[in-house]
Amino acid sequence: MPKRKDIQKIMVIGSGPIVIGQAAEFDYAGTQACLSLKEEGYSVVLVNSNPATIMTDKEIADRVYIEPITLEFVARILRKERPDALLPTLGGQTGLNMAMELSKSGLLEELGVELLGTKLSAIDQAEDRDLFKQLMEELGQPIPESEIVNTVDEALEFAAGIGYPVIVRPAFTLGGTGGGICSNEEELQEIAENGLKLSPVTQCLIERSIAGFKEIEYEVMRDGADNALVVCNMENFDPVGIHTGDSIVFAPSQTISDYEYQMLRDASLKIIRALKIEGGCNVQLALDPHSFKYYVIEVNPRVSRSSALASKATGYPIAKLAAKIAVGLTLDEIINPVTGSTYAMFEPALDYVVAKIPRFPFDKFEQGERRLGTQMKATGEVMAIGRNIEESLLKACRSLEVCVDHNELPALSQVSDDELMRKIVKAQDDRLFYISEAIRRGYSPDEIAELTKIDVFFLDKLLHIYEIEQELASHIGDSYVLKKAKQNGFADTKIASLWDMTAEQVRRIRQEQKIVPVYKMVDTCAAEFESATPYFYSTYGFENESVKSSKESVLVLGSGPIRIGQGVEFDYATVHSVKAIQAAGYEAIIMNSNPETVSTDFSVSDKLYFEPLTFEDVMNVIELEQPKGVIVQFGGQTAINLAEPLSKAGVKILGTQVADLDRAEDRDLFEQALKELDIPQPPGQTATNEEEAVEAARKIGFPVLVRPSYVLGGRAMEIVENEADLRSYMRTAVKASPDHPVLVDSYIVGDECEVDAISDGRQVLIPGIMEHIERAGVHSGDSMAAYPPQTLSQKVKDTIADYTKRLALGLNCIGMMNIQFVIKDEQVYVIEVNPRASRTVPFLSKVTDIPMAQVATRLILGETLAELGYEDGLYPESSMVHIKAPVFSFTKLAKVDSLLGPEMKSTGEVMGSDRTLEKALYKAFEASYLHLPNFGNIVFTIAGDSKEEALQLAQRFANIGYGIWATKGTASYFENHGLHVRLVEKIGSDDDKDIPAYIRKGKVQAIINTVGTKRTADKHGQIIRSSAIEHGVPLFTALDTADAMLKVLESRSFTTEAI
């Protein structure tokens, strides 16, 4: 069927902010889809609230709206733009739910807007648990015994009938939100109650648990002419019971027979045809390891996290083709862009093994609940490609950036056998390492399989890795064993530790013996057809397929997996850097390990190496490609940490030089630089042990801010008030960065702001100053930020511009740098300098219209600001007000305290823009799902030193009609100052009348809770905060954020005064 001519303008809905369960894979999908539709000649309108995405760049769609994805705003845009059609299946669960809401509101019908791609009825059938069950029964497809429930009592009654364990799956939620496995009545009561609350239709499926079955996924495509194919099938290392987003996954499936493969393939195709899905779809199945019995677990009728993995694993661009199918093209008409010669109807074939390992946030949240279940907890993932399972698994392990270069955590050698077995049976995020340790201790694969239900085949591969370790240890220097180890994915550093030499020595031995990697092409067809994709992975075999270009090239290092502190913003900068390299006439090469992102789409760069970002792997690529130099500024801390070893190995680092990077990152050198440049900073000292830290703090005076040097996202950063807390910090937290000392700084309570600057070494362009809404003490990544600044005097702005220029030139910055300031009594202090692109680059690029990463890259390659048409100094401010607001994933992370402080906790961001501060704030709150009604009850539970300020907020809330409730100390302070409040207990003896009870009953509309300086003793506060998160009640732990929300409410309310 030719593409449709009756539609001209199509609206695409993005997926909004990054949260656990919905990450960068939707930026990749949305970007591909918009470009694909434009390629076919359609006009594209995009709506997304997340500025840190490539898809919200002006050139991706014809009209880009960075607005909240809520009915109110999407309806306005629909009325204004009047598109002919809407494509919702590329915006994750957010896009689907929005389409359902628009349809139910009658607006699509009123405006004559057609839904493209998969029809609403099919989305409903796949997402509504009852309809899905009916369809499967009609198709004769087996599903586990189950019951749809709308109340907790119904859930308990059904479970009593079929017996425990049971699985709870809420309808229309993302990443298993609110679900879980329940072994008894008590657990079911809790999980079902929570699941019903989180489901937008108050519906859950309770089903018999089939935990222990193999989990197999099929990524399938279908077009309007009923052509359907399997793009990729994948097997989870972990059996059913652990969310697929938290499982290690291999593609293609490794342990199923051809008969089983065909049986599950037929089932998947039968389901996609019955649902009449047009585009991509993911089918999850459970296979009994002891028979040919299987169950259908669920179907995602949209592009998903698995689609991104399948696209990168096979090279087959699912989202791009799904968009073409949506406008009527069929798979047998679309040319596969990878081969350029076969049609998209051709099923990909793989002659390699792909491993995906999730990246979890527990290095940030040590107190978080690490047990894995049906609710997703990973923030990101890595992918690695190899010729065998061992190679791809070990490459993926070292891509994780959790300080391991192998499937081994050194600390586990100290763990008792009992503890080891416990951790293996009760799966946590690090179970792979515990299983590997058990194998090293002599437990057999069969014993471990019995305990974990993981297939013996995979455990045998772990045993094989251990056998090679032993061979290496007993054959030091042996080239035959060295080659075997390299063919099975061993890193030089691991071999060096077994041979008791340096990695450099191992590398030399390898090179002398000509044991070097070759690079193979990912071509979707197992080399059956000619292919020209510049997409490569390394292996130790024969025949290198990557040929060094005749053109001069530049290598850009990506930022690896998405984690808290290093998100999609860095991928955004990487992609823009590549565009600038190409525009300057060079060949751009990207190296990265993250399957979710735009940077690892092979059509972005001239060459893509899907490899771990370690010194060894990067050097191997450099030796083959011989680039002009390497750019490390855009890959976050991952890339910056590689600058020094690469430079020592003689590699040219482009942009700011290593010695200058060091001056910004090393505390003593930085202090010296600031003194020379005459720039004030809060008084501080470095300490290498506990006594030095205590001595420094006494000298400076408490409170002090303590942190390790060289970290990202405020890892292990704390504000300490007294010596006892400082000693405890030094004993527990300093392992964050053992080679570097701890910084002890005077903690200044002031207004914080930050600047991104771009310098060519002579002139400095400052695109803008962002003012944080929360005062110093909340990590910059968790603060709301306003551009242009709303309260800074001209004098302060001038000082900031002056200090920025001095710093950029004084530290010989070429390219980009980020500086954070704190302002107290009009005095400006520098808190820190990052000599690289920061997480604010996409936001600031969007609001100033300066493509900052592109400009910085051109300067890194030798051009000047003047040549690019930019002037020295602070760029003129925008007339609009733009707010960047953080978004958190606390609902997914049990036991993680939602209290904001100097360590970063947010997973994503949104932007709100309008002509006034209040309107921009309103949009930012709406986009980040912080919605406050115009009236209701608000609870204040406030620490001693903030009561005076809280009283002013409470009075303002009372003026607009809110009922003020407060806990004991806060209530008496408010009453003493003439404000009438209702007294409530924090955590009461009568658990029907305390704050969590009122939250459960829906009596509380918001909570404002601050803690004193002894944050640790705040057990009750943590229970209240968790309760608010669980029930979706807006929670403010910084008074400044509550003040911003009040501004919005006040601007929306009319003044009603008696005369």
Curated annotation (Swiss-Prot):
Pfam families: CPSase_L_D2 (PF02786), CPSase_L_D3 (PF02787), MGS (PF02142). Its cofactor is Mg(2+); Mn(2+). Mn(2+) 4 binds at residues 832, 834. Keywords: Amino-acid biosynthesis, Arginine biosynthesis, ATP-binding, Ligase, Magnesium, Manganese, Metal-binding, Nucleotide-binding, Pyrimidine biosynthesis, Repeat. Residues 930-1059 are annotated as: Allosteric domain. It catalyses: hydrogencarbonate + L-glutamine + 2 ATP + H2O = carbamoyl phosphate + L-glutamate + 2 ADP + phosphate + 2 H(+). Transmembrane segments: none annotated. Residues 402-546 are annotated as: Oligomerization domain. Residues 547-929 are annotated as: Carbamoyl phosphate synthetic domain. Binds 4 Mg(2+) or Mn(2+) ions per subunit. It comes from the Bacteria. Mn(2+) 1 binds at residues 284, 298. GO terms for cellular component: cytoplasm. ATP 1 binds at residues 129, 169, 175-176, 208, 210, 215, 241-243, 284, 298. Mg(2+) 3 binds at residues 820, 832. Mn(2+) 3 binds at residues 820, 832. Composed of two chains; the small (or glutamine) chain promotes the hydrolysis of glutamine to ammonia, which is used by the large (or ammonia) chain to synthesize carbamoyl phosphate. Tetramer of heterodimers (alpha,beta)4. This is Carbamoyl phosphate synthase large chain.
